[in-house]
């Protein structure tokens, strides 16, 4: 069913919102009801620090141990979820426009904005990026008048990773292949999300081109978002492996909703958006959820459907919108379901609650059962002077938006830049304290249950020991093995432990060290000297006890990044360590 209304109807709708009767007034408080805190209480666990402005995070198909994070300044990070260690996977910073829309160090919406892995990435190593680049040659799509340069160009590119199943592999920059290039009239409203849908095709979100009210140079008379002859203000659907596009670099699926219709760009899958900066597919239902950033009044969440028109700039959210000539536009009245042919959001809020919606994910993880099936999203900031907010509502119906209750935090304490989702469906909060693509305050935080699972364990063996001189594995007692179980007690500054071992000489020491797999590190907690019970007989034994007066910050660090710490047992024949293993979370406590 063709849901996009005709160009004639769109023009008529635009006229009705520009020439309003004198009784039409701007609404001072479109949605009086506030967003209150409610629902499951959660903790935010730091995973990685020292980024700039992280805005999107996903796992690569077949890789459950890492999260790949786009940083607005041009770095694509590969982050180890156990240790928090980060590696540069791809650096496109040299390709970007100079960031800082109002000068160095200032706010900007351009940069490295999107990432998607090909569904068969584990075999073909293909991935795709969305970047804001300087004008370089003719664009595949442009709304700019002849002789008028664009502010920047939005570029979708394909890259390849050799040996993608190898953990140390990174992107080969020489494999870059450009799919399409789009002129951007202004610096803002880029959108920037990339996702492969359940159908195996690539979906791309584009904003209306920038400026206020979808007006100005590079904007159609009715606004780009209601002009089906250009791609701005739309979500596109393409086949990266195809060749039937005008430039021959990608394919246009034959079942796209507007293929063959005169005056319509055939790449369009849905239209009528202002700035759908983030969208995602629900892994359980396949539905596409998008957060569309509003103008001066309304932020909205949409369930996007094929061929749908989501209203901008005829409407802002479920409210009629008046572009108001040369003055700032405003909403006039709520008009659910009208005009005919426009689709209203499933959730919305006004600017008393936030200024820029950040779309997220429907939670399908296991760690927080009470959150399952809820759409998790947020807002960049309550105001430009305040921090961001985290929201959720039930995805199965007309759920009321609630703000997360955070353990130990009255507020998020960050500008919210985006969300991440790992291979297990667990979600991550991405943000920084500056609200700009500069500095190193960017963080990645896991949304975790209210009560942290403080039970950890490590399987111990001699092969895991690393030679201090050569860095080679196998420096321990290759006949021995063991198990260490750890219970973190931050409330009373204790680390309790149980050690078991077999086929080694009598232990002389045991510790928790700082260090990921394959790396030797310093002692942080002495275990064996704090043992209440110790037994060793015929090469086997056990010990248990609690280390007292341990720094609570260290306990938190171990709990947040168990993979960055290891337990080992020392013997006289192996003073550097007989058996060793890195910590991981355990479902069994001691």
Regions found by a protein language model. Give the residues of each.
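Beta-propeller fold detector
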Residues: 45-46, 85-94, 167-180, 246-257, ...
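Conserved blade-ending motifs and adjacent loop-strand segments that build the rim/top face
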Residues: 273, 399-423
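Bacterial N-terminal signal peptides that target proteins for export
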Residues: 1-8
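Acidic, Gly/Ser/Thr-rich repeat motifs that build Ca2+-stabilized beta-propeller blades
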Residues: 25-212, 278-281, 286-297, 353-398, ...
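Metal-centered catalytic cores of metalloenzymes
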Residues: 451-510, 514-590
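C-terminal segment of classical bacterial N-terminal signal peptides
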Residues: 14-23
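Blade/loop signatures of beta-propeller domains
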Residues: 24-43, 165-173, 245-261, 323-342
């Amino acid at each position: 069913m063709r849901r996009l209304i005709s160009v004639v109807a769109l023009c008529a709708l635009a006229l009705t919102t520009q020439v309003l009767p004198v009784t039409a007034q701007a609404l001072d408080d479109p949605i009086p009801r506030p967003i209150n805190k409610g629902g499951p209480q959660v903790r935010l666990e730091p995973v990685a620090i020292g980024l700039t402005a992280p805005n999107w995070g996903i796992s690569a198909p077949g890789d459950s141990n890492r999260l790949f994070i786009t940083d607005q300044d041009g770095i694509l990070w590969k982050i180890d979820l156990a240790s928090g260690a980060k590696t540069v996977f791809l650096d496109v910073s040299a390709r970007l426009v100079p960031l800082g829309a109002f000068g160095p160090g200032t706010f900007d919406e351009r940069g490295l904005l999107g990432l998607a892995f090909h569904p068969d990435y584990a075999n073909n190593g293909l991935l795709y990026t969305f970047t804001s680049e300087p004008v370089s040659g003719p664009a595949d799509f442009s709304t700019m008048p002849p002789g008028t340069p664009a502010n920047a160009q939005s570029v979708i590119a394909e890259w390849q990773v050799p040996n993608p199943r190898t953990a140390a592999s990174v992107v080969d920059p020489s494999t870059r292949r450009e799919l399409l290039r789009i002129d951007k009239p202004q610096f803002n409203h880029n959108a920037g999300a990339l996702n492969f849908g359940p159908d195996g095709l690539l979906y791309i979100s584009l904003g209306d081109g920038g400026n206020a009210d979808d007006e100005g140079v590079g904007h159609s008379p009715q606004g780009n978002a209601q002009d089906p002859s250009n791609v701005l203000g739309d979500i596109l659907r393409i086949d990266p492996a195809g060749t039937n596009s005008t430039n021959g670099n990608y394919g246009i699926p034959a079942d796209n909703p507007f293929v063959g219709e005169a005056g319509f760009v055939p790449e369009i899958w849905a239209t009528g958006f202002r700035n759908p900066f983030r969208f995602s597919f629900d892994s359980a239902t396949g539905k596409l959820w998008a957060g569309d950033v509003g103008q001066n009044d309304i932020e909205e969440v949409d369930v996007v459907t094929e061929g749908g028109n989501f209203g901008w700039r005829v409407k802002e959210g479920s409210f009629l919108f008046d572009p108001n000539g040369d003055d700032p536009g405003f909403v006039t009245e709520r008009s659910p379901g009208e005009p005919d042919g426009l689709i209203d959001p499933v959730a919305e809020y006004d600017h008393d609650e936030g200024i820029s919606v950040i779309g997220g994910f429907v939670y399908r993880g296991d760690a927080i059962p009470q959150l399952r099936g809820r759409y998790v999203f947020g807002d960049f900031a309550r105001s430009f002077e305040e921090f961001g907010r985290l929201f959720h509502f039930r995805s199965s119906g007309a759920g009321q938006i609630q703000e997360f209750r955070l353990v130990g935090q009255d507020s998020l304490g960050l500008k919210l830049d985006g969300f991440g989702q790992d291979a297990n469906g667990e979600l991550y909060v991405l943000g920084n304290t500056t609200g700009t693509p500069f500095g190193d305050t960017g963080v990645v935080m896991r949304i975790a249950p209210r009560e942290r699972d403080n039970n950890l364990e490590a399987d111990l063996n001699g092969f895991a020991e690393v030679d201090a001189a050569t860095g080679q594995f196998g420096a321990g007692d290759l006949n021995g093995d063991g198990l260490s179980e750890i219970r973190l007690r931050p409330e009373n500054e204790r680390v309790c432990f149980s050690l078991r071992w077999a086929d080694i000489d009598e232990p002389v020491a045991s510790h928790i060290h700082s260090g990921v797999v394959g790396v030797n590190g310093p002692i942080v907690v002495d275990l064996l000297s704090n043992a209440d019970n110790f037994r060793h007989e015929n090469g086997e034994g056990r010990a248990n006890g609690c280390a007292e007066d341990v720094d609570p910050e260290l306990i938190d660090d171990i709990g947040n990044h168990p993979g960055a710490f290891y337990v080992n047992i020392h013997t006289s024949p192996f003073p550097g360590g007989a058996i060793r293993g890195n910590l991981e979370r355990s479902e069994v406590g001691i």
